Amino acid sequence: MRDKSYSKAIAAAIVTQVFWGLSFLASSIGQETVSPFVLMSYRFNIALIALTVPVLLGRQKLRLRGKSIKPLLLLGSMEPCLYFIGEQYGLRYSNSAFSGIMIAVIPIVTIIFAAAFLKERPSKKQWLFSALSILGIIVITLAENSGGSITFKGFALLCVAVVTGSAYSVISCGVSGRFSVFERTYFMQIMGAVFFTTLALIENGGSVAAVLAPATNLRFLLAVLFLALGASVAGYSMFNYAVSHAPMANVIVFVNLATVVSVAAGIIVLHERLAPVSLVAMVVVLIGIWGVQKYPPKENLED
């Protein structure tokens, strides 16, 4: 039987991917004004401030005394640090279709990692429906491709994103017994803030004024506030909760929902046109997600 924590975990996974799907639009708006490093610096510093407030008010506690923080360092290194380097710059050195296809592979790689390190083995039907969902994403990205070339550098960077994004999910699940959802999420924002602020300052010749200059741009600020509070604070908190209370295959397949949300946001907000085949592919993605939830391993049904 599946309990309430499982239902909450699946709900959290869905809401997370809505936030992350919309984050592509917010990132595009933010990068009209600044580089990816500066945008990430703002994002994670604001997120860190937001999460520090409840700590200072005594509403949340960090129980790290006597614990090794090496797992948290590894977690934060995978994501946000290395993942966003791979994703942001992988897209820059390849076309959008290839990038979308590479990122769509993350659920399958994550399931493989979970089977190897967490001993979570999905059912054959879950493998099938996961592949179906990925097929839908491939069709969408090819149909919506805006052109561009593919370089080896772009491929290598996207491989970094795939491996680190998959590793993050598995590590978060693996350390859930030692560190709370809040502790994991908080530490990720610390590492993101330090890492990307350092890179932003290096990129701008050490000029703090240059990094702070975009703060007067309202359109930029609204985009970065969504990224910080929605995609980082809410998104990572809910995803860390989800992987702690539901099988990895059931959670990670929702990653493909983010692409559906991203395409829908482009149509609604930016008035982009949707190819008919993309609409069919979006339905295929949703069927794939449904199938993964519908056909868990038999042992999960008996728990």
Question: In which residue ranges do the predicted regions lie?
Answer:
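Glycine-/small-residue-enriched transmembrane alpha-helix faces in small-molecule transporters
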Residues: 1-41, 148-174, 198, 300-303
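Specific alpha-helical transmembrane segments that line the substrate/conduction pathway
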Residues: 38-49, 78-79, 87-121, 126-130, ...
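Transmembrane alpha-helical segments that form core, pore/gating elements
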Residues: 51, 110-112, 149-208, 238, ...
